[in-house]
Amino acid sequence: MVEHYSVLHKEVLEFSKLIEGEVFVDATVGGGGHSYLILKQNLNLKLIGLDKDDYALKVAKERLKEFEDRITLVKSSFKDLDKVLQSLQIKEINGILFDFGVSTFQLKLERGFSFQREEFLDMRMDTTQKLTAYDIVNYYREQDLYNIIKTYGEEKFASKIAKSIVEYRKKKKIETTKELADIVYRCYPPNLRHGKIHPATRTFQAIRIEVNNELKDIEEGLEKAINLLAKNGIIMAISFHSLEDRIVKNMFKKYKELKFLEILTKKPITPSDEEIKENPASRSAKLRVGRRI
């Protein structure tokens, strides 16, 4: 099994102690890391784990087998949380966790999320859906590519990158992560090519968001989750870039103003130096927590 780190797990466990009642949802169960720790700590909890990824559910089932009488795993996007709970005849929940990061095993399983190796440009969380990164890179118009890379990647060289992609694909289709990463790399001035993050990071993020409709799903999922919380129910959300964090922050603020939610994290909680050293991928993680009033 591929190793999977649970980001900010100590902090998540601390806030999980506040959960009253017994229904908890892991909206992004992934490899089951957070779920395992929460089930071990909160002995009365029954857990519903959601994921769009078949392989993630397989990994989670294996990871959580000692708790099999307390877990229900469902293949679903968290944007359909209301439908999932309805099918399970559950009216409200006592706690929910969202972790918007790409799982370590997804990065290692040659699904096109990583530019560290030569992989087919896929990037689908749900491998049964049709749209892939290959389709976007090879068939979207230059203007649409620019909009995606600029908006979802907050990439300052978006115009040059979109233009270079279109020029390159006139000669041959862009098929692999390495090809795309090299195109982006060459769009950066030589003095900016060796910064903290690889030049292709933002472009890959942008295309992944487009493939999986991530930001719209996050907004929808958070809204439904807050409305399904029982009194004193806890919502925890871990984001990995400013676009995700902004959605969480604004959604919490909206429901605070509606006197519906108390925000328990004045500022987002970030990983300790120790955690970043152990798991460098956690460096950009931010945790925000709210409680239903």
Curated annotation (Swiss-Prot):
Function: Specifically methylates the N4 position of cytidine in position 1402 (C1402) of 16S rRNA.
GO molecular function terms listed in the Swiss-Prot or TrEMBL record: rRNA (cytosine-N4-)-methyltransferase activity
Gene Ontology annotations for the cellular component aspect, listed alphabetically: cytoplasm
Key word Repressor present: no
GO biological process, any: rRNA base methylation
EC category name: transferase
Record keywords: Cytoplasm, Methyltransferase, rRNA processing, S-adenosyl-L-methionine, Transferase
NCBIfam families assigned to the protein according to its UniProt record, in alphabetical order: 16S rRNA (cytosine(1402)-N(4))-methyltransferase RsmH (TIGR00006)
UniProt xrefs under SUPFAM superfamilies: Putative methyltransferase TM0872, insert domain, S-adenosyl-L-methionine-dependent methyltransferases
Residues given in the record as S-adenosyl-L-methionine binding sites: G32, G33, H34, D51, F78, D99, Q106
Highest taxon of the lineage: Bacteria
EC number: 2.1.1.199
Subcellular location: Cytoplasm
Family according to the record: Belongs to the methyltransferase superfamily. RsmH family.
Region (Disordered): 272-293
Record's catalysed reaction(s): cytidine(1402) in 16S rRNA + S-adenosyl-L-methionine = N(4)-methylcytidine(1402) in 16S rRNA + S-adenosyl-L-homocysteine + H(+)
Name under which the protein is recorded: Ribosomal RNA small subunit methyltransferase H
